């Protein structure tokens, strides 16, 4: 059976990717499961560049097909912040409750039509022959005025989806379905 390495140490992401790739004929393993302990510097200027950096680094170390992702939140009014720094916005140890409160405060007084935002996810696949493929998906919405909902994670409680009339945290959908909606 073929092996695909998913370049993450995040067990929630591993669970999600295994659900998404359940129908392929390959064993999907994490870096830890593959015995890889690499501290990869994500110094790209786009989500795609960061995903490629991770995928190529691990593929070159192992000779195995490697998938990697980079994702985050872009808020148009804030010049697409926090963008590629979404996880590190206000510091990696800062809770998302505090990060969300900060973003809401920064948008204080900004009308609905200027609170447009999107979740972005870029995935890179690096192959042993040196080739790399990337794909980018987005989910459009707005930033709400307060946190709402307990489901999801990160910025989900402030990411308002007008077509559903609620935040992403209030929508009860499975993770693979959630990712499939990013197109």
Where are these regions (language model features)?
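Single conserved hydrophobic/aromatic residue that forms the stacking wall/gate
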Residues: 171-183
């Amino acid at each position: 059976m073929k092996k695909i390495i998913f370049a993450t140490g995040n067990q929630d992401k591993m669970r999600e990717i295994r659900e998404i790739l359940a129908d392929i004929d390959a064993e999907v393993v994490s870096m830890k499961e593959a015995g890889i302990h690499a501290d990869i510097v994500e110094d790209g200027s786009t989500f795609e560049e960061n995903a490629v950096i991770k995928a190529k680094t691990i593929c070159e170390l192992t000779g195995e097909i490697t998938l990697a992702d980079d994702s985050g939140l872009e808020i148009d009014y804030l010049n697409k912040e926090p963008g590629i720094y979404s996880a590190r916005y206000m510091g990696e140890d800062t809770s998302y409750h505090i990060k969300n409160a900060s973003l809401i405060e920064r948008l204080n007084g900004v009308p609905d039509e200027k609170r447009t935002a999107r979740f972005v996810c870029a995935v890179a696949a690096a192959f042993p022959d040196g080739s790399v493929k990337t794909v980018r998906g987005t989910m459009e919405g707005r930033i709400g005025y307060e946190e709402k909902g307990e489901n999801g994670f990160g910025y989900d409680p402030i990411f308002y989806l007008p077509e559903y009339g609620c935040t992403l945290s209030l929508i009860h959908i499975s993770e693979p379905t959630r990712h499939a909606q990013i197109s």
